[in-house]
């Protein structure tokens, strides 16, 4: 576009003892333990919700569901003066001497925002220590045309059902070589759909 961008953008410099990227079980536990010891902590999550795999997996921690435990830990972290908790914030650069760069989306999700709210903020963070707890990714089975619409990782289908309440198909075929796909099959079954499983 040739029109001038009227949005506001900011940059910020920050220092911390520990930067934790990712808010799944490992990231939350790491940030919480460090914060309780008095360290200055920044917790960064690129999605809008905290919890990572805890939002999808049927796990129990301290007699709470994974989601409830994540919510409890985030609530406690936000109350601590030595902790900065950021969602919609992606750490994308890791440079010499623990200098990291984080991209925070501050305004695009807001229906209404003040004229002083920036659209995005770029953080330059110097840290003593860094924990990269960005989670694991399901290992896909590679085959021709596996990038066509309707083909997805079983973990993606499970996330759609558990987190967003979206059923991704009525006659799913689950092609797998490990146990994790069976959790997705069970979730389909819980939603009234009978999946076909091809297990190598």
Give the predicted meaning of each segment:
Residues 1-200:
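Residues forming the flavin
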């Amino acid at each position: 576009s040739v029109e001038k961008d009227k949005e506001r953008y900011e940059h910020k410099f920050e220092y911390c003892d520990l930067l934790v990227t990712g808010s799944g079980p490992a990231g939350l536990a790491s940030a919480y333990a460090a914060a309780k010891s008095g360290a200055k902590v920044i917790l960064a999550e690129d999605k809008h919700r905290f919890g990572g795999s805890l939002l999808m997996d049927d796990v129990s921690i301290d007699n709470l569901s994974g989601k409830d435990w994540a919510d409890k830990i985030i609530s406690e972290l936000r109350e601590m003066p030595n902790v900065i908790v950021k969602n919609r914030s992606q750490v994308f650069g890791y440079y010499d001497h623990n200098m990291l760069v984080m991209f925070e989306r501050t305004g695009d999700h807001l229906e209404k925002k003040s004229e002083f709210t920036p659209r995005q903020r770029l953080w330059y963070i110097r840290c003593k220590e860094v924990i990269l707890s960005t989670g694991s990714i399901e290992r896909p089975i590679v085959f021709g045309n596996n990038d066509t619409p309707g083909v997805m990782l079983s973990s993606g289908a499970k996330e759609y059902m558990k987190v967003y309440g979206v059923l991704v198909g009525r006659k799913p075929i689950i092609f797998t070589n490990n146990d994790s796909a069976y959790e997705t099959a069970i979730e389909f079954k819980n939603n009234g759909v009978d999946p076909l499983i091809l297990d190598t």
